[in-house]
Structures are given as C-alpha cells and as structure tokens.
A protein has these predicted regions:
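Beta-strand-centric surfaces of beta-sandwich/beta-rich domains
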Residues: 24-380
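Positively charged n-region of N-terminal signal peptides that target proteins for export
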Residues: 1-4
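Sec/Tat signal peptide C-region and signal peptidase I cleavage site
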Residues: 19-23
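Bacterial N-terminal signal peptides
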Residues: 7-18
C-alpha cells in the first residue's frame, strides 16, 4: 500500500480546510449518500412508448402538452426540457404552468424562457444551484417542488407555429407517508414592464441633479417582482433588462415590504448590489451558484442584460404578505424594459397572479420613451 495520500484526497482536505461552506456541502452530501433513502424515484418523460427513438412530443399552435400528471405525496426534484421550434420567439410563446393538489389556478405561470432565466427570448448557457441552461438548449430546474395529493404541469403553445419536437424528463420522489402539514409549496410568478414608466425623460446622465435630488422612501412606482399573501419565504428572482435609454440601468434599489409594512424593512443600495455584483458588474458577465449576471450588455439604448439571485443564505420570510420590488433607476427615473420571474415557497391557497400579457406584448422591443439615446420623446 502506498504511504502517501492520493492527489484527490489531498485536494479535498485542502478545500475543506480553506472553504468552510464547501466543506459543509461535502459533509451534507456524504451523510445523505451513506443513508438508506425513504422514497421511490420515479420519472415521467417523453420517451417513445413504442420503444422507438421518437422521444418527443409536438405542440400545435394553441395546444397544451401535459408533461406531468401524477398523484402524491411526492417531491419533484428535477425538470429537464429541450426542444426544436422554428418560431423566432418560441421562448416567449411557450407558457409553463404548474398546479398543486388540484388547485384551479396555477402556482407557477411564466413563459418557458423566462422561468429558466432567458427573459430576453434568446438562448445562452449559464448555471446556478437551482437553474441552468446547458449546451444545446437544455433547460434544467432543481427547485424542490413538494405536493401532497397531486401535481400537474403543462406547456402551452401561444404562438402561431407548431413546435415539432419537445422533449422532457421529470424526476420525482414518491413517498409512502404524507408530507408534514406545514409543508410550503413552490411558486413562480412572471412580471414585466415594457416599458417601466420613468417619472422624467429630461435628464442626460444618471447623476443629473434633477435625478439625484428625487427621494423614494415608500417604493411608489417601483417595479414589482411579486406580491403574495399567506405564509412563506422569498427565495429569489431572475430578471432581464432591455435598455430604452443610454447609461447604466442598475441605479435602482431593491425594497421588500413584509407583512403590510409601509416602509421597507429590507432596503438595498443598487441593482447590481442586490444581485451581489458591484460597480456595473465590472462591465463583464459572470455566473455563480446563487447569483450572477450571465448577460451584461453595453450601457446604451438597446443594451441587453440578464441577472439572478437566490437567497440560500437567508430566504426572506413573511407571515401575512410580501411585496418584493426594485426601483428602475434612482427613485424610478429610468424607462427601461424589465422581464422577471420570482421564486418563493408559501402555504396554499395563494393569491391571484396578474394576467399574463398577450404573447405579442411579451416580445422584447425598444420603446419610444425619450431621454438619452432614445430619439422619440414620450410625454411626461
């Protein structure tokens, strides 16, 4: 037997000594993998029922494909989708919905691309702990999604062209015992502002005195990520921005209004700060486990950016209600387009979601808002 430790073991010891967080992850995985599991793992997929290789389903215009329809108690652990669709805007035209325990209104409703962080309607690769987009057009979700009685997940084609090939694999843990009575259910809500209604277009740069002197203490006019009633906790958001004006879009502060408060008990210092970057993200893209800016566009009209953050360290709890918001520019002076999906867990029933905009209104387009870089003035 060799007396020296293998390079792999040495590496693991070094990482454990110098990275406590990663060491905790290793310990957690080791404990989980060495214990008997109390579930049966099941999968629902688009596999060819004949045993052939046509492992896909088509979705006709106006049609709805049910990708999951199973009884609980269970925990959905992984969703994988990929597709071929000729329509240019299919990521905005396909709508993902999830229903738990026989509810009539979905707990998840979002364009397919937006749910997976592709809020500008284009594919790009990125990875995080809970969502990723891999080569080539592979959409992955690892959000744990429990249900006590039943789960139904659908994909609806609101476009005008057929989706010829839609593939899916969904893995879930089936349990023999009921889930705890206080189990919270997964929710995701799409919102957009095309454009955000900035309060002025009479500015040249974000630091103009007119802008700097404006105050915003109560979140009036903020872009709303989500609103919820009941008990739960906010986990995070993926957001995309199409700039209608020149300059840095991210001067806005995040504000969380918990349980009906009039002043936010959680108030941030800037958009890139909330998404755990700094100083315009250094004008470069990045993608980490729980935060990132995988798309960082130029700071001008037409610039496109995508960002995300998950509150793994401390999900934001609420007992009665939550209103999660962010300014669009300082005190809401900018008029850029925002597209977002927020993710949270809460008790059922949930409050009503805002109506999903018609598909043609979900396509990202520059808007005539006036201001720097925007040639058409809008009334203010």
């Amino acid at each position: 037997m060799k007396r020296s430790l293998s390079p792999l073991i040495l590496t693991l010891i070094f990482v454990a000594m110098h990275s406590p967080a990663l060491a905790q992850d290793l310990t957690r995985w080791q404990a989980s993998l060495t214990q008997p599991q109390d579930y049966v793992l099941k999968r629902v997929s688009s596999a060819d029922p004949s045993g052939g290789n046509a492992d896909f389903r088509p979705i006709e215009p106006g049609g709805t494909l049910t990708v999951l329809d199973v009884d609980g108690p269970a925990l959905l652990t992984h969703l994988w989708f990929t597709l071929y669709a000729p329509a240019r805007h299919h990521l905005k035209e396909l709508v993902l919905r999830m229903y738990w325990d026989g509810e009539r209104t979905p707990s998840v409703e979002a364009p397919l691309g937006d749910f997976f962080g592709l809020g500008l309607g284009d594919y790009f690769t990125w990875e995080s702990e809970l969502l990723s987009v891999a080569n080539d057009r592979a959409l992955n979700s690892f959000f744990p999604m429990p249900f006590q009685k039943h789960a139904r997940i659908t994909v609806t084609n609101e476009g005008r062209e057929k989706v010829p090939l839609f593939y899916f694999n969904l893995d879930y843990r089936a349990y023999s015992k009921t889930l705890p009575a206080d189990t919270l259910y997964f929710h995701a809500q799409f919102r957009q502002a095309q454009p955000n209604p900035g309060w002025t277009n009479q500015w040249q740069v974000n630091s103009d005195r007119l802008v700097e002197e404006k105050k915003n203490l109560n979140g009036e006019g903020n872009y709303v990520w989500m609103e919820a009633t009941g008990r739960g906790h906010f986990l995070g958001v993926a957001m995309s921005v199409l700039q209608n004006q020149d300059g840095w879009w991210g001067e806005g502060d995040d504000m969380f209004f918990i349980d009906g408060e009039l002043r936010p008990s959680i108030n941030g210092t800037g958009s890139e700060d909330y998404f755990l970057g700094a100083f315009d993200f250094g004008r470069s893209s990045f993608s980490y486990r729980v935060f990132g800016a995988p798309v960082k566009g130029e700071e001008r009209a037409g610039g496109r950016s995508s960002v995300y953050r998950f509150h793994f360290d401390s999900p934001i709890p609420f007992s009665k209600s939550l209103r999660a918001t962010i300014e669009h520019g300082h005190a809401n002076h900018r008029s850029d387009n925002y597209y977002s999906v927020s993710y949270w867990y809460q008790s059922e029933p949930h409050g009503p979601f805002p109506p999903l905009p018609p598909v043609d209104q979900r396509i990202p387009r520059l808007q005539p808002v006036g201001g720097p870089g925007n040639s058409v003035a809008a009334p203010h």
